[in-house]
Amino acid sequence: MSSVLAAYEQFLQTTEDRSFGDQQFVQSDTLKAEIPVFVLNTNDPQQRFTLMNFCLRLAVSSSAKSAIKQGALLSLLSLQATSMQNHLMIAARAPDAALRIIEVDAIDPQDYTLTINPRSGWDDIKIRAYRALSRDLPISLADRTVFVSRDAEHAVCDDMDTYLNRIFSVLIQIWIMVCKCMTAYDQPTGSEERRLAKYKQQGRMLEKYQLQTDARKIIQLVIRESMVIRQFLVQEMLTADKVGAYTNRYYAMVGDIAKYIANVGMSAFFLTLKFGLGNRWKPLALAAFSGELVKLKSFMSLYRRLGDRSRYLALLESPELMEFAPANYPLLFSYAMGVGSVQDPLIRNYQFGRNFLNTSYFQYGVETAMKHQGTVDPKLALELGITDEDRVDIMQSVEKHISGKAGDDISQPAGAFTMSLSRSAFINNNTSQDFSGARLSNYEQGWSGTNQDETRDVYPESTMHRLQNIEPTDSDHNELLMPELESDSNPFNRPRFTVRAPLIPEISHQNPTTRMNRNINTRDNTRADHQDTNEDRGSNVPDDILGDLDN
């Protein structure tokens, strides 16, 4: 039997094996769209700044085609390089790339008229057409500019330091839009604004050159549609990762943003490893988990074999990304999400409610995490020299801080699959009575926790006996406030607000039928009093007001 299990494990690992770069398999070339990219032959800061604005306008233009927008973005991503043409050769190596280099000798800052080098073969018609494209901005952009600040586009740029601050401010925003371009590009999560605020605080981004929200969204869609741009960006991130700590300003920025982009689309896999395997709890020995544990082992081996590009499978649209989908290990995924919902409050932001989520194993993960809140790892405790007394003290301290919390505390399971915890109720409802045909008042519903259709009549015990002890001879009994609830050793039985008593304390001794009759009589008496008052004031009050009172 052991040989069969070993063969099964080897079989699963073999199914995940991939052989890359086999020379006997040559892919056929496909048709490619020509992508025009602009290369400036000068390092003048004003000319580069003007070309930056021109490329931004082309990238968000309403009438520009997709290939023109992609070429504008590639030119924009190369404006920080000393030699733009050499930097663009990184993108030229992409299988779908068909770049056409357009050499620009000069560009007019006023109307973005290009002066093209004769080697590029452009005529005046194309120059006028591209100038018209740069003017055709979406109507959603305010002030006919891509920037939030109206005067940012036409500011003077007469030194290199000013230009670098501006181009890096724009490039940071483009890289931020890469983070969610392939996963949740249409879901506003707030992470984009937080990252913008971070780089503003660090001084890497000038607020004056912040792009408008609609402009950033258009740029994000261009990146999402272009495999050439995404392959170029992946190569830039790999370069930033390999150069080390001593690097230039641009690659330091790319390396920082790459931390947000790495392993995008693989959150389920890494969260399962973190909360399912990382804790090393005993439920992993369940027989139901054995097959999925072997699968996870083969997936980890596949991830290592993919090398550096394994972190960017979503950007590269790699088919290996499907191997790491949580549907391949649903039980371990459900258990890990239950554990994570207790241990990490950030799991609330992760949409783990899939159709293959097993609610039983999710609840089991929640129970396991709750039970292990104060436990100590025996191996680490032995390393640290923790005694039995220290272990008990640690467990009691953790339990004291966790058990005394409620609401949105970290110990509450997150998500739609919650479970009832072993805690005392806010109000003790063990003394409920059923009355047919009676409708509870709002006051009674507030204490009983029922809606208007239910017929339970429940009062807190500590208040009931106080109301019953009120003497009927007390002339001020109608103005008494409800006594405060008695102190309870259980913190969850304490009231969260002060409640006033009804104006008639004897209401607690009346059954619902008596209360209903009393309300009817009170309503009739009130109506009669209004009629008597109207008759007395009839000669002094206008007719229209009398009509309102009669109704």
Swiss-Prot record:
Gene name as annotated: N
GO CC terms: helical viral capsid; host cell cytoplasm; ribonucleoprotein complex; viral nucleocapsid
Region called Disordered, residue ranges: 509-551
Family: Belongs to the paramyxoviruses nucleocapsid family.
Pfam family, one: Paramyxo_ncap
Domain remark from Swiss-Prot or TrEMBL: Ncore is globular and carries the regions required for self-assembly and RNA-binding. Ntail is an intrinsically disordered monomeric domain in the C-terminus.
Renumbered residue ranges of the record's region Ntail: 405-551
Source species taxonomy: Viruses, Riboviria, Orthornavirae, Negarnaviricota, Haploviricotina
Region ranges (Ncore): 1-404
Coiled coil: none
Name under which the protein is recorded: Nucleoprotein
